[in-house]
Structure formats: C-alpha cells, structure tokens
Amino acid sequence: MDLEAKVKKMGLGHEQGFGAPCLKCKEKCEGFELHFWRKICRNCKCGQEEHDVLLSNEEDRKVGKLFEDTKYTTLIAKLKTDGIPMYKRNVMILTNPVAAKKNVSINTVTYEWAPPVQNQALARQYMQMLPKEKQPVAGSEGAQYRKKQLAKQLPAHDQDPSKCHELSPKEVKEMEQFVKKYKSEALGVGDVKLPREMDTQGPNRMLLPGGDRSTTAAVGAMEGKSAEPKRTQYSCYCCKLSMKEGDPAIYAERAGYDKLWHPACFVCSACQELLVDMIYFWKNGKLYCGRHYCDSEKPRCAGCDELIFSNEYTQAENQNWHLKHFCCFDCDNILAGEIYVMVNDKPVCKPCYVKNHAVVCQGCHNAIDPEVQRVTYNNFSWHASTECFLCSCCSKCLIGQKFMPVEGMVFCSVECKKMMS
C-alpha cells in the first residue's frame, strides 16, 4: 500500500462518527473526534462506544473478520464488491401473541441479535432469561449495552494489524500468528440447547460437575428389559445451580459436553459481563471475552489500548505502555524522566496537573503544586505552610493545632468563630 493510500485509509478511520454527540457527557462534549492514536474522543476523552455513532456495518465487518478462517464461516458472508467477510447476525422479530388474538394492532419486538436456533420459542425463552436491561431490543438500553460490549470485548485492534498504530513488519507478523493461534485454540461461539439434548450428543458416559458419572440406561436394561435412557442432571458450570428441564442452556464446544451455563451466567470470568453474541474464548477451564483472553496472553498498552508485540516497553503504576505512548493524558508530551501525577489512573505531566487538576489553596487562592505538602478537610485544601493554613480571624498558624472548619474557613477558637459570624 503506497503512502497516499495509507493516509487516505487513516483519514477515513478518523472521519467515522465525527461530530456524534456523547451519550455520557451530553452537551459538555463538542462531538466525537477520534484521537490520533488513543482510541478515544479528543474532546471529552470518552470511547467511541460512548458516542451516538452508527457502527452496525463496521461491527459486522469486525466480527466477520474474526470468524474468517475458522469453523464458524457459516456465520459470515462475503460481499461481492470487495470480498470483505460480514457477520450474519441473527435478527429476531417477535409478534406479540396477545395483541394478535384480540384483533388489534399487532405489536412486534425486534432483537438486534438472537441465538441462531430454528426453534423461535427457544430463542424467546433465552431472551427472557437475560436481565431486562441487557436484552438487545432495538432502540433500548439493552441494545446500547450490546453495542458497548461489542466494542469493549472484541476490539478491532486485537485482531487486525491495520487497526493498530505504526506496527513494525516484525510486530505485524507476530500479531498475525497470535490471532491465528487464538482462532484455532480458544475462539468459540455458544450454542443454545435444552439439557436433554446433551444426552444424545455427548459421549455415552459423561462427567458431571463434581466428577460423578451418569450411565445412559436404567438398571432394568441389564435384565433384558427395555428402559428409557437415564437423563443427566446438569448443573450450571458458573452458579452451580441445577438446570431446569425445559429451560434453555448454553453449551460451549471447547469446554466439553459436561458443562452447561444458564443464559445469564454465560459471562467473562474476568469482567463478569455477558459474552456478547455468545462469542467466547476458552482457557484453563474459564470463559473469557476477547479482550480479557488477550490480556491473559499479552501485555496491553494503557495509552493506545493495543496489545504489545514489541520486546521493549515500559511498566509504570502497575500498567504496561509502549515506550512512545507513556505520555501525558492531557497534552500527549512524553513523560520519560519527567514528573507526573496520576489522575483517574491516567498520567498527567506537572504543568497540565497544575493547570487542569490541581486543587486551589483556600488561603492564597493559588494552585497547590503536587510536590508540596497540603492540608485537606472535606473538599477544601490549604498549603501546609505558616502563610496559608491560618485562622480566618486572627491569622494564627494552625499547623499541628486543633481547628474549627466552617464553609472553607478555619478558626483557632470559638471566640474567633463568633467574631466572624
């Protein structure tokens, strides 16, 4: 790809969603403008998923690429125009049966995603077993939740080198090998089934949670009498409660036939969020979303949110950083060898801290330097000096002394307080 094409591609990526309002900051944000490398809005610092950006086609491309070259190619279709794999998510439209019987206008409910099962009643049951605020009904809180989780759990930059910032040829190759490996060893999509279906699909003797085994025939069959197969009593692998016979359960092929989950229990073991569209990663007996599976395999840069494939990176404040991305969160100046202050888990250089975040001294009304000692009471602060932390009436120094706070003022005694009231 020549330089002009690269620049054009980069420009298109930064134009997507430009100006979209932030659903979190409301009018405080001037509109979405993608930071050059941080994956956040330059105006409000929120992620793209927090903005009212229409991402359905982009998300379908992302998931389609995830399923490319896997056993889940039945879930994708390639566009004739450019050959890009697109996710064929199952959209379900349900008709309100009560309204239909009463001969009135029929109400319909559209789910932006539903499990791809032939039995629509089973899909309906599955949806009803999810928390209402997480059911992906079009235009609802649940649809917004699904959109956020698609962005959070399956970042495009965890699978596509072209979505990353300035990878070297060696890093691109390492990332491609990493993606190929997790597709073949960890990636899976859950299946919605009734527990009784598992007895006909699993091995003749299956391990139950806890290690017990169940046989497939009753004792009477040993005497030549016909008998119904004995049904396995399944428990949810997550909550350990029993599975009800007629309720849908989720089966994860990579986990094995002996494990089932309640729909609301099919969650990432790290973030405890519902696994979006039942897309999971299996590792060491645990379910993960894509993000947290990758985090368990590779360090992630706290600056750009990308996985680190370079041997050289830095660690600070219990986080990992590309060398070029350990920067001030406000001005993007590199912080190597500089004084910085952590603000909401983000490093900020000293000048930006004083300008944007420092508390103001109630005594001198100047910003308090991060390296200077201070006295704080409730929401008020003072320089811990003989010039600032003084009685608001008689100017007695209060360092190491008892004091009486009153609405941003401090007094050395009841008498001084009365004189100022």
Curated annotation (Swiss-Prot):
Residue ranges with Basic and acidic residues bias:
155-164
**Molecular functions (GO terms):** zinc ion binding
Q: Where is the LIM zinc-binding domain?
A: 234-297, 299-359, 362-421
InterPro entries named among the record's database cross-references: LIM1_Testin (IPR034958), LIM2_Testin (IPR034959), LIM3_Testin (IPR034960), PET_domain (IPR010442), PET_testin (IPR033724), Pk/Esn/Tes (IPR047120), Znf_LIM (IPR001781)
Biological process, per Gene Ontology: negative regulation of cell population proliferation
- GO CC annotation, single: focal adhesion
For this chain, the family text in UniProt reads:
Belongs to the prickle / espinas / testin family.
Function in brief:
Scaffold protein that may play a role in cell adhesion, cell spreading and in the reorganization of the actin cytoskeleton. Plays a role in the regulation of cell proliferation. May act as a tumor suppressor.
- How does the entry describe the domains? The N-terminal and the C-terminal halves of the protein can associate with each other, thereby hindering interactions with ZYX.
Q: What is this protein called?
A: Testin
